[in-house]
Regions:
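Bacterial N-terminal signal peptides that target proteins for export
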Residues: 1-8
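Short amphipathic alpha-helical "recognition" segments used for binding
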Residues: 8-10, 350
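Cleavable N-terminal signal peptides of Sec/SRP-targeted secreted and luminal proteins
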Residues: 11-15
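N-terminal signal peptide c-region/cleavage motif recognized by signal peptidases
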Residues: 16-20
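Metal-cofactor-binding active-site regions of metalloenzymes
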Residues: 22-297, 303-344, 349-355
Length: 355
């Protein structure tokens, strides 16, 4: 056997295990055993999750369990389980808290301010029967075939409501999430959180920097450190609000002042609400860059069905990363720009499919 034949034989022997491994994965991927595919992907080591809305990444069972546990801190929650027609005609059906929205969660203080008729529409979260508890959990899942973008954007956070204003509950959902990620081999996560004020059990305001300290304390716990998952945060603004520019100024400064915890600014909210168009924020960002250096931008864009140039306009804002980017393929010039460029698109497999 000459040298070339020996070399060929050597490489065949060397590569056989890799070929066999590739065939093995292809067999699982293309087969009918979906459980085997899920199990394989679950235990496969992973780098990181760069696009994660913390309050949108909590299983309903976790929300229920952790919300009840907050009684130890003095928090009590109620949820709306029936409609008794307590209000007259002419209410705002498009408000953040529409009267007809079931399973909206409120604090004990909010409950105390209701009249007797509306109090009868609510039950303590701890007192739900099995049917109500199941419906409560389904209310924050996309579990019906007709549920999609509208259900998600118009009811999910509106229902969570008071639960998202508790900074300790936020920290405990973080720990639950990190534990789940550690179990499937994740090593890094970036969570998107808001910068609104939080509240204590007596209704006292807990400012954002105090909430950051609560997150720091949670991450410093030994059992959390031992998980081996690094967590950082982006501060997000709701881009279509009338005061979105002021929100942007605030979170930009907070990210600059808390580099140990915060790594960037994001803009979220329905992109099909045209009041949040990207170019709206260009003057504000130019102003902010003159005051603060090194603040990174990772911004939702291209999360709509219609062809448009929102991804390009978002890159113009200075974003390094694009969230979703679903309609990027309809913008040929920007596709060419990004083909060899330094930009990253965060592909969100589940939400891109469902929303």
């Amino acid at each position: 056997m000459n040298f070339n034949n020996r070399l060929t034989a050597f490489f065949i022997v060397l590569l056989l295990p890799l070929v066999a491994a590739a065939d093995w994965f292809d067999d699982i991927r293309d087969g009918d055993d979906r459980e085997a595919l899920y199990r394989t992907l679950y235990f496969m080591p992973k780098g990181g999750d760069l696009h994660n809305h913390l309050s949108g990444a909590v299983f309903a069972e976790w929300w229920y369990e952790l919300a009840l546990a907050q009684q130890e801190r003095g928090y009590e929650y109620y949820t709306k389980v029936r409609i008794d027609n307590c209000r007259d005609f002419g209410g705002n059906a498009f408000a953040r808290a529409p009267y007809l929205l079931l399973f909206r969660n409120i604090s004990a203080l909010e409950y105390a301010e209701l009249d007797e008729c509306e109090k009868g529409e609510y039950k303590r979260l701890a007192d739900l029967d099995d049917r109500e508890k199941s419906a409560w959990m389904n209310s924050i899942r996309l579990d019906k075939p007709w549920e999609g973008r509208d259900e998600f954007f118009q009811t999910h956070w509106q229902r969570l409501n008071a639960l998202t204003r508790n900074p300790w509950l936020q920290a405990e959902t973080l720990v639950k999430n990190l534990q789940a990620y550690a179990a499937e081999g994740m090593v890094y996560v970036e969570y998107q959180i808001g910068a609104s004020s939080y509240e204590g059990p007596d209704g006292e305001t807990i400012d954002t920097t105090q909430a950051f300290d609560i997150l720091r304390e949670a991450l410093a716990q030994k059992d959390v450190q031992d998980l081996g998952v690094t967590a950082r945060f982006q501060l997000a603004i709701l881009r279509f609000l009338p005061n979105a520019e002021d929100q942007l100024r605030r979170v930009y400064q907070l990210v600059y002042e808390n580099p140990d915890l915060l790594v960037g600014v994001n803009m979220v909210g329905r992109e099909d609400n045209d009041k949040g168009y990207p170019a709206r924020f260009l003057p504000t960002l130019r102003e902010l860059r003159q005051q603060y250096s090194g603040v990174r931008l990772s911004i939702h864009a291209g999360e709509v069905d219609e062809p448009n140039e929102h991804v390009r306009d978002t890159l113009l804002l200075g974003a390094d990363r694009i969230g979703h980017g679903l309609n990027l393929i309809t913008d040929d010039d920007t596709m060419l720009l990004m083909r060899h460029g330094p930009y990253l698109v965060e592909i969100n497999l589940i939400s891109n499919l469902l929303l």
